[in-house]
UniProtKB/Swiss-Prot annotation:
Organism from which the protein derives: Escherichia coli O6:H1 (strain CFT073 / ATCC 700928 / UPEC)
Protein name stated in the entry: Cell division protein ZipA
Membrane-crossing residue ranges in chain numbering: 7-27
Regions annotated as coiled coil: none
Xref: Pfam families: ZipA_C
Biased composition (Acidic residues): 51-63
Biased composition (Low complexity): 99-115, 123-150, 160-175
Cytoplasmic topology ranges: 28-332
């Protein structure tokens, strides 16, 4: 189908070009004839005025007839326009005198004038002639648009992955909201640091003496302490050793451990300590610890000292109690 359409278009184009050529040639001839008629009339008027010139024309009638025959041959050689340009000016003069009685005979010489204006129509004639010569060439440009169509097809293929890339871009900000700003565990770390305390008191022998191991063991057991973890004694919630440990008792001498067999054991003193917060009521546990320390000191003949190993005073006891309350309130 495409080939048939091409042939039809070529034929129609050729016919149109030929029609244009014929029409142009016909119109050019028509214009030339009109111009030719106007010019001889003007010249004839001038010739009538000149009597001397008329006599010369009558003498040259025979020559004019010969030149008329040449004019008849001129249309056959219409292509040689440039060579005939100088001659037509002299050829027209004699025929005009004879042309007065023979006006119809002057029509063939009209072809002599076209050489002057002939190059103008010949130029458009050559242009359309070149066009049919290139008419078979349009088949090549028909193949060229076929290739861009194929090239245009992959373009949307490349444009398709572009939105896909845009779809991946929003995926990146999705990973941006990281849970890093969640720094809430920091206050959790503050609680143990700010509100942990250890209440310490000592039971020591008088200056220059030591506590007897056997007496110390009996007083410790009477106060409700039981030997246990870390090789030290612990005071539990229940006197039989059950329940959580409320406070503990260690040797004042490093490493602070005891040997259950304390018959031959002596020491300058022992240390009783309680960690706050602790199980139950810390103030009640503190009172129980103070009572145990006083009981042991009375049994072994020692004294109760504070954490600086100074004599225990009522002010120091109130200070211990204030510390316990602060920790208790902070952990409430």
């Amino acid at each position: 189908m495409m080939q048939d359409l091409r042939l039809i278009l070529i034929i129609v184009g050729a016919i149109a070009i030929i029609a244009l050529l014929v029409h142009g040639f016909w119109t050019s001839r028509k214009e030339r004839s009109s111009m030719f008629r106007d010019r001889p009339l003007k010249r004839m008027k001038s010739k009538r005025d000149d009597d001397s010139y008329d006599e010369d024309v009558e003498d040259d009638e025979g020559v004019g007839e010969v030149r008329v025959h040449r004019v008849n041959h001129a249309p056959a050689n219409a292509q040689e326009h440039e060579a005939a340009r100088p001659s037509p000016q002299h050829q027209y003069q004699p025929p005009y005198a004879s042309a007065q009685p023979r006006q119809p005979v002057q029509q063939p010489p009209e072809a002599q004038v076209p050489p002057q204006h002939a190059p103008r129509p010949t130029q458009p004639v050559q242009q359309p002639v070149q066009q049919p010569a290139y008419q078979p060439q349009p088949e090549q440009p028909l193949q060229q648009p076929v290739s861009p169509q194929v090239a245009s097809a992959p373009q949307p293929v490349h444009s398709a992955p572009q939105p896909a890339q845009q779809a991946f871009q929003p995926a990146e900000p999705v990973a941006a909201p990281q849970p890093e700003p969640v720094a809430e565990p920091a206050p959790v770390m503050d609680k143990p640091k700010r509100k942990e305390a250890v209440i310490i008191m000592n039971v020591a022998a008088h200056h220059g003496s030591e506590l007897n191991g056997e007496l110390l063991l009996n007083s410790i057991q009477q106060a409700g302490f039981i030997f246990g973890d870390m090789n030290i004694y612990h005071r539990h919630l229940s006197p039989d050793g059950s329940g959580p440990a409320l406070f503990s008792l260690a040797n004042m001498v490093k490493p602070g451990t005891f040997d259950p067999e304390m018959k031959d054991f002596t020491t300058p003193g022992v240390t009783i300590f309680m960690q706050v917060p602790s199980y139950g009521d810390e103030l009640q546990n503190f009172k129980l610890m103070l009572q145990s320390a006083q009981h042991i000191a009375d049994e072994v003949g020692g004294v109760v000292l504070d954490d600086q190993r100074r004599m225990m005073t009522p002010q120091k006891l109130r200070e211990y109690q204030d510390i316990i309350r602060e920790v208790k309130d902070a952990n409430a």
